[in-house]
Amino acid sequence: MAAQKSLELLTGREREVAVGVGCGQSNADIAAHLHMSEATVKAHVSRVLAKLNAANRVQLAITMHDAGLA
């Protein structure tokens, strides 16, 4: 499964942020849940989108859902 192999490229923290996006959480919600700044969440989301070749949060959420992580 291509999505699963792509997810292996993510760091643990990137994966946690991606799960939050997949669950429909805002950057502020993810930041509060993971005890990090909103700017850090935004940076993680940008890196995750690039690593997974996703154009936007919706594509990322679909990827996470398809992988059973959201």
Q: What annotation goes with each model-predicted range?
A:
Residues 1-7, 33, 68-70:
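N-terminal regulatory/sensing modules of transcriptional regulators
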Residues 1-19:
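Regulatory hinge/linker segments at domain boundaries
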Residues 10, 54, 69:
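Hydrophobic patch in the ABC ATPase nucleotide-binding domain
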Residues 19, 32, 62:
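A cross-family signal for key residues in well-ordered alpha-helices
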Residues 20-22, 39, 65:
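Short amphipathic helical patch at the helix-1/turn junction of helix-turn-helix
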Residues 24-59:
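Recognition helix of helix-turn-helix DNA-binding domains
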Residues 28, 65-66:
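Terminal helix-turn-helix DNA-binding modules in bacterial transcription factors
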Residues 50, 64-65:
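Short, linear, compositionally biased motifs with a strong N-terminal bias
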